[in-house]
A protein has these predicted regions:
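Flexible, glycine-/basic-rich loop-and-beta segments that form/coincide
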Residues: 251-317
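Long recognition/docking surfaces used for binding and targeting
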Residues: 1-14
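C-terminal target-recognition/interaction regions appended to catalytic cores
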Residues: 322, 326-565
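A short acidic (Asp/Glu
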Residues: 42, 67-72, 87-90, 110, ...
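SAM-dependent methyltransferase catalytic-core segment centered on the flexible catalytic loop
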Residues: 103, 107-209, 218
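Class I S-adenosyl-L-methionine
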Residues: 217-218, 230-271
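Short secondary-structure boundary/capping segments
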Residues: 15, 76, 93-94, 153-156, ...
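Conserved S-adenosyl-L-methionine
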Residues: 25, 31-111
Length: 565
């Protein structure tokens, strides 16, 4: 049967012949020409202009040869999983040896065995290059996805199919306790290259690869990093926004980095150039140190409180007022801090405060001993907006000896009370699993006596009795012991004003929206905002303006105190 001819009208159309859904299910995204060219420039700066003649080059996930198709090489090997890609790109890099190869599953024979069915798939020239320790560059743009939790991309790609990461290399990485890094496809590709370097004792090899930056910064990549640093030395790197790749979000960054065989000395800090496309050219717009928390205290560790042995059952919430489970929490808790992961990108949707346990876990109990730290870290995480440059920056334990630390901490208490992700609430007699529960709001900031006075003034018997039979809440008592900045005090003042001015509407609101339990004396601001929005929305607008002043004052201190670098 004759081979079917595939017509290609322009290089930009090559990738469109590969089914888009299929590519995304595997986490594959192909390299734009402008970034492929820049990668060649970086390699030339490191290895010299003649590197294409002096080095063997292997792109082991070549796709339709975007990385190499516009250049000539003395000895180039291109392999990919899909035969269709080889057919489409058959007329490109005709000097290359192109072959189908499942890089994450098929064995590569070592020095002890050069025969066997699997070994036959590797071209003889490439086998000889490995055996003879020839200078070699592994030049790749591997798939980025992970099916478990797309922390790299914040689901910008959608999830990849669950089976995509179930490879031989995945099993090898899991056996070495690499954790979540083992499910990540680009980490699997790089680890396979590390294995090849070790197996063949390669001393003059380089890895040049595109990837997200999480492999350098993320806590879940600790073991993977150690393996990489024991075998390769960082030479150079750039970071750019992912949206320069087709149909990808602009909220996170992609990197291209170059590594040489050797041992990395500084394992915590890596100087990258920040680049962007300006006037159809790639320009350096800044520099940035990518860092990890491997040898220092992370923010998530800093805020943890030693768990007590005394646990109590409590209802778990999925938002401020909806119960979705039951669990155990320390008996001295005053709330719960949802603190998922430890980087900027996860602060958007995975950081919050609750008056009881949260059904999604990934957080810490809040008690008197870690209350200030909780508020400080919560504020540091919510104050910084995620972007493609900072998305994978990790939070650190702050400099507590800094002159502004206590001021920031005091401000953060107020900031935390009124942030949109602060889901503190007061709930009474909620039923779950045939039990009735009361949830007290220890984050309430006003005095019991003032609420009693308001209840008497507006004939709200339920609220009066609820307060009268209770005690002062923790945060109110805490606020009596600290001094607040003018900006923080202004927020407290207008929040108090909202409570006082909207109190007369509580009975009416409760009839329409009983689920908010607005007559509880220690209602959280989440509940009070709902009341205010319905009856006095102009007050909320004024509140947001005052709250923004506090936020703007605090934001630079996140970096001054070294929560972030």
């Amino acid at each position: 049967m004759a081979t079917k001819k595939i017509k290609i009208h322009s290089p930009e159309n090559y990738d469109r012949f590969i089914d888009d859904k299929e590519r995304r299910n595997k986490g594959q995204f192909y390299t734009p020409k402008i970034f492929a060219d820049y990668a060649h420039k970086m390699i030339s700066e490191a290895l010299g202009n003649n590197w294409k003649d002096e080095y063997v080059v292997w792109d082991n996930c070549c796709g339709t040869k975007n990385l190499t198709r516009d250049y000539k090489f003395k000895e180039l090997y291109c392999s990919t999983l899909e035969n269709e890609e080889l057919e489409i790109s058959a007329h490109l890099n005709t000097e290359a040896v192109s072959f189908q190869f499942d890089f994450l599953n098929e064995p590569i024979a070592g020095r002890e065995s050069l025969t066997g069915v699997y070994d036959d798939k590797l071209p003889k020239g490439l086998k000889d290059a490995l055996l003879e320790n020839k200078p070699i560059v592994f030049f790749i743009n591997p798939p980025y996805g992970t099916p478990c939790c797309n922390d790299e991309t914040n689901k910008s790609f959608g999830g990849i199919t669950a089976g995509a990461c179930n490879t031989v290399i995945n099993s090898e990485m899991k056996s070495k306790k690499f954790g979540r890094a083992s499910t990540n496809l680009y980490a699997q590709f790089v680890y396979r290259l590390i294995m090849i370097k070790q197996k063949y004792n390669l001393s003059n090899c380089y890895i040049a690869f595109f990837s997200p930056t999480l492999f350098l910064t993320g806590q879940s990549f600790y073991s993977f990093r150690n393996e990489l640093f024991n075998n390769f030395v960082f030479i150079d790197g750039i970071q750019f926004k992912a949206s320069h790749f087709a149909d990808v979000s602009s909220t996170w960054g992609i990197s291209f980095s170059l590594w040489k065989a050797g041992k990395q000395i500084d394992k915590n800090n890596f100087l990258y150039k920040i680049v962007d496309v300006l006037d159809n050219d790639i320009k350096i717009i800044d520099k940035k140190v990518l860092y990890n928390t491997d040898n220092c205290i992370s923010g998530s560790y800093w805020v943890k409180q030693t768990n007590t042995k005394n646990k109590i059952e409590v209802p778990l919430l999925r938002n401020a007022i909806t119960v979705s489970g039951e669990g155990k929490i320390d008996n001295n808790f005053i709330g719960y801090f949802l603190n998922n992961s430890n980087n900027v990108s996860r602060s958007i949707s995975f950081v919050g405060l609750f008056s009881t346990g949260f059904s999604g876990a990934h957080g810490v109990n809040v008690c008197k001993e870690n209350f200030e730290k909780t508020c400080a870290l919560f504020s540091a995480r919510k104050l910084i907006e995620n972007n493609w440059i900072n998305s994978k920056d990790e939070y650190l334990a702050p400099n507590e000896s800094h002159l502004k630390f206590q001021e920031f901490t005091n401000d953060s208490i107020v900031y935390s009370l009124f942030n949109g992700a602060s889901n503190q609430s007061s709930l009474r007699q909620i039923k779950y699993h045939d039990k009735l529960w009361d949830i007290k709001n220890e984050f309430f900031w006003m005095s019991k006596s003032e609420i009693e006075s308001l209840a008497l003034k507006y004939n709200n018997d339920y609220c009066f009795n609820d307060a009268h039979n209770s005690r002062e809440r923790f945060v109110y008592e805490k606020l009596q012991t600290i001094s607040l900045s003018p900006e923080a005090q202004a927020v407290i003042d207008i929040a108090n004003d909202i409570v006082r001015k909207t109190f007369k509407y509580r009975e009416s609101f409760n009839k329409e929206h009983p689920e908010y339990q607005i007559n509880n004396w220690d209602c959280g601001f989440y509940q009070i905002k709902k009341l205010c929005k319905e009856y006095m929305p102009e007050l909320l607008k004024e509140f947001k303006e005052v709250y923004k002043v506090l936020s703007d004052k605090m934001r630079p201190m996140v970096y001054e105190l070294v929560f972030l670098k």
